[in-house]
């Protein structure tokens, strides 16, 4: 009975996607080792798009024989398009859960979990919890800091990760608050440039990332169910871990 129900759900998902699924990628900041690319044109980005999360999501779509088109745009625009019944985006990933996002989209089971923290210069390793009003906490525009439980909001927000790293190295930021793994991933892949070494500090908190599907997409739930099935199967079989290990292995201890 459960097998027949699954076949029905998959069939419904196929029927709902007579047109190619519009898959959107936020293109202001790469997110290595999970999602990254090279080049500046849409074609260059599409041809070089890779990463551990990207691999799993696109594998899931291909397994269900779902045709898709890639669209690159700023992350804020991706979220705006997902709110629209006739928007340009049907699906994205590397999305953290927010209550307001859940009003217009469905979230998959967790695709991966990463650690939250902040970066300092080794010679200026201040404790964030001892920040004074004159100290500068830097962040990136559009990033979700809800789960960080910060003692205060970033006082200076930059337009990109590289800009935030630059400000930290110029000592115009005392701390750069961020997810840990994507920063080291970008550095190791040569996507972020450093003139001075930086040091990470864990906040003892983690953050889950998901596939995000537009609620108003016809038969969005069957599509979500098929994605969840693939993700859970990949995780239980060890395939997901093998994919993540292949792209980058980041140490979990300082």
Question: Which role fits each region the language model picked out?
Answer:
Residues 46-59, 121-153, 159, 164, ...:
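Bilobed "Venus flytrap"/periplasmic-binding protein-like clamshell domains
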Residues 19-100, 138:
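Extracytoplasmic small-molecule ligand-binding "clamshell" domains
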Residues 71-133, 142-145, 201-204:
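Acidic, polar ligand-binding/catalytic clefts
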Residues 83, 94-103, 175-206:
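A ligand-binding cleft/hinge motif common to bilobed small-molecule-binding domains
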Residues 28-29, 113-117, 191-228, 248-254:
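Periplasmic-binding protein-like
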Residues 54-63, 212-246:
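Extended ligand-binding regions for polar small-molecule ligands
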Residues 59-64, 71, 76-89, 106, ...:
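Short helices/loops that flank or line small-molecule/ion binding pockets
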Residues 67, 147-159, 194-196, 230-254:
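Ligand-binding clefts/hinges and TM-proximal coupling segments of bilobed small-molecule sensing domains
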């Amino acid at each position: 009975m459960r097998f027949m129900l699954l076949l029905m759900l998959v069939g419904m998902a196929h029927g709902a996607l007579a047109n190619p699924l519009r898959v959107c990628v936020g293109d202001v900041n790469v997110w290595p080792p999970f999602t990254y690319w090279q080049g500046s044109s849409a074609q260059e980005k599409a041809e070089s798009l890779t990463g551990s999360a990207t691999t799993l999501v696109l594998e899931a779509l291909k397994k269900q024989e779902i045709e898709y088109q890639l669209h690159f745009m700023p992350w804020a625009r991706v979220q705006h398009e997902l709110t629209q019944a006739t928007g340009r985006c049907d699906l994205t990933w590397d999305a953290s859960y927010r209550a307001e996002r859940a009003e217009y989209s469905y979230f998959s089971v967790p695709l991966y979990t990463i650690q939250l923290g902040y970066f300092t210069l080794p010679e200026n390793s201040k404790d964030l919890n001892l920040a004074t009003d004159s100290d500068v906490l830097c962040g990136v525009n559009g990033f979700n800091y809800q789960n960080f439980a910060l003692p205060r909001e970033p006082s200076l927000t930059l337009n990109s990760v590289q800009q935030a790293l630059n400000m930290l190295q110029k000592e115009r930021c005392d701390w750069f608050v961020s997810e840990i793994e994507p920063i080291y991933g970008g550095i190791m892949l040569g996507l972020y440039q450093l003139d001075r070494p930086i040091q990470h500090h864990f906040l003892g908190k983690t953050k889950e990332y998901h596939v995000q599907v537009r609620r108003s997409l016809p038969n969005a739930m069957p599509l979500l169910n098929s994605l969840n099935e693939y993700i859970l199967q990949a995780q239980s079989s060890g395939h997901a871990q093998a994919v993540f290990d292949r792209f980058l292995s980041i140490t979990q201890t300082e």
